[in-house]
């Protein structure tokens, strides 16, 4: 209902007055804890026949109709509430649920993944698919949300995860610590190199996000965007492009299918290619990629 969305939107003024810069709308399908229901009967949300009143241009209907729309309407209300308070500042909003058009208001992530090599490898095609579906600002929980993560898995994941549009490490309560410094000095150094590489590429990311905002072209592209006529590239799910000019090849990739042409190694940080976990970066011949300095926080940037 419009009145409910207005009520929700107005709640943000109190949060933002505390100095909060970003908001995360989580479990907004909405999720329902149903542990007391037999597993085969769980649906994870409210019963599908739960009525929604609608309102405005929206008809009344069951939750089966509104399940995805609920998250979409929620993030729109959240966005409007943030903009009321800070109209001169671009808001950061993250959502788990949404529907067509929600990319105008919020970033998203790929859900509660597992700490395992299969989910690490799925990160690339899942993020590419979200981008092709209109949601340019997306990425997985680096390191895996559920289950424990070992040092090797974490380092491999972060080594390419820093080049995903939304780069974030996350963990479920009850799993092991998954901070960049949690796996010893060597992996801490690996993490530092990876994060500094992303910081240096922030001007390029900024440009790609602006282009995505204006045109809908994703930030993270499948490699066949380099040459749509090259049928070899259609099935590649390990390497990916950042815009037209940067090719990312994760360290885990085995015999990736790469586009023809001139692609030169791109160096951003001293020692990056002596670290086995870092993704290889290649710059397209004849192109220009803007890069910045190594910084400690995005607040040090002028854009």
Question: Where on the chain are the PLM-derived regions?
Answer:
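Catalytic-domain carbohydrate-binding cleft regions of carbohydrate-active enzymes
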Residues: 1-278, 282-284, 299-300
